[in-house]
Amino acid sequence: MKLVKPKKFLGQHFLKDLKVAQDIADTVDTFPELPVLEVGPGMGVLTQFLVKKDRLVKVVEVDYESVAYLREAYPSLEDHIIEDDFLKMNLHRLFDGKPFVLTGNYPYNISSQIFFKMLENKDIIPCCTGMIQKEVAERIAAGPGSKTYGILSVLIQAWYKVEYLFTVSEHVFNPPPKVKSAVIRMTRNDTKELGCDEKLFKQVVKTTFNQRRKTLRNSIKPILGKDCPLTEDALFNKRPEQLSVEEFISLTNQVEEALKTATASGN
């Protein structure tokens, strides 16, 4: 079989360490009864361990050369190799709307977008595991007060328990990336509803972290406007990285109340 050359524009760094691949494959075992979707399998170094598990496995790959390689290397997967862009797919059609585990050695250039896609489909993705850039993994797992705590941390931790599992050297890839990688696992928590307007919650989180050096009283103004009244809650004197998920929910409710008050008074 003709080997696939990694394509820079697709952010491809092919994993070549079988022990690391096995360890990543084993992270899906938290939900042994669910099917698995692997994103960006490349030449199947992770796939080979996933297919050995007694469960349905599908892979989605945007690179036509990798798809051709996979079809030849894994004939038993023929009907489950999907040539498509994961970010544009309707995930509810994959397993007839049933839940599945998401995994992969994710391309660095779209890892954040993949996790936003996961959040959009959290009703059918109870678990997401895989390898990403170490810096992004640390950001997702970070808690309040950390310099790496940010938009991804809050939005993901609102719905998922995050585990930073292990760090991976850059030398186990072809070509080696310039940074280290890490494997994480995100498992849905018990939250059914946030207790606030979800769309406004996202807006509040993104707006405040985009001006993270400002106090919330100032960074929230793009949403509220200059003349919108705020309560004297001490929460507004904090910076976004100081707030827990629960405090962001409280903040969102206060912002919504302030918007209603402003609308009612004609501001």
Swiss-Prot record:
Reactions catalysed, as given in the entry: adenosine(1518)/adenosine(1519) in 16S rRNA + 4 S-adenosyl-L-methionine = N(6)-dimethyladenosine(1518)/N(6)-dimethyladenosine(1519) in 16S rRNA + 4 S-adenosyl-L-homocysteine + 4 H(+)
One term of GO molecular function: RNA binding
Record localization: Cytoplasm
UniProt keywords, alphabetically: Cytoplasm, Methyltransferase, RNA-binding, rRNA processing, S-adenosyl-L-methionine, Transferase
EC number: 2.1.1.182
TM annotation in the entry: none
GO cellular-component term (any): cytosol
Sites where the protein binds S-adenosyl-L-methionine: H13, L15, G40, E61, D85, N105
Annotated GO biological process: rRNA methylation
Family statement: Belongs to the class I-like SAM-binding methyltransferase superfamily. rRNA adenine N(6)-methyltransferase family. RsmA subfamily.
Function (record text): Specifically dimethylates two adjacent adenosines (A1518 and A1519) in the loop of a conserved hairpin near the 3'-end of 16S rRNA in the 30S particle. May play a critical role in biogenesis of 30S subunits.
Protein name: Ribosomal RNA small subunit methyltransferase A
Native species: Bacteroides thetaiotaomicron (strain ATCC 29148 / DSM 2079 / JCM 5827 / CCUG 10774 / NCTC 10582 / VPI-5482 / E50)
